[in-house]
Design a protein with these regions (language model features):
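Short, conserved beta-strand element in jelly-roll/cupin
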Residues: 69-71, 80-97
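Short, surface-exposed secondary-structure edge patches
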Residues: 67, 87, 101-105
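Conserved short histidine dyad/triad with adjacent acidic residue
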Residues: 53-54, 66-81, 116
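A generic "binding-loop/recognition-motif" signal
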Residues: 72, 83, 102, 118-119, ...
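A short, N-terminal "cap"/entry segment at the start of jelly-roll beta-barrel domains
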Residues: 3-62, 77
Length: 139
């Protein structure tokens, strides 16, 4: 699969070997473990993290692929990524994304990308759970 950009002279080519080379499987909703973690990155309250795939299923280039739930007034504190990137895809709820100290409103459908060497965080500023997919890729 090749992804081309309108910018000249570059493209991103994702080789099948980027992903796990073994036979793929699946995980069923309700059968995955959900872990509660308090004060992540020094943030207020707690998060609920559901690994959508386990470490042995992620391959060499992916460190985490999880669904994260932030209850109202809870946050995933500011943290930095070194040697990896992290992407958030907001599924539902409202919050405030911390992009290297700059607050950006977050809502369903938004995608946030934290590049290698940068820092970020997320706070639920709404009245319902803020739910997003988090993907960490190793450089």
């Amino acid at each position: 699969m090749k992804l081309f950009c309108t910018q000249p002279f570059w493209y991103v080519k994702i080789e099948p070997s980027f992903f796990k080379q073994e036979e793929t499987g699946m995980t069923k909703a309700g059968e995955r473990e959900v872990v509660k973690a308090e004060h992540v990155g020094g943030g207020a309250g707690f998060i609920m993290k559901e690994a959508l795939l386990e470490a042995q299923e992620l391959g060499a280039h992916c460190r985490m692929f999880s669904k994260v739930t932030l209850p109202p007034n809870c946050e995933l504190g500011h943290h930095e990524h070194h040697g990896e990137t992290e992407t958030y895809y907001i599924l539902s709820g409202n919050g405030m994304y911390d992009d290297n100290g700059k607050a950006i409103p977050a809502e369903a459908g938004d995608v946030f990308y934290c590049k290698d060497g940068d820092g970020h965080g997320m706070k639920n500023t709404g009245t319902e759970d803020l739910i997003f997919i988090a993907l960490i890729l190793k450089m």
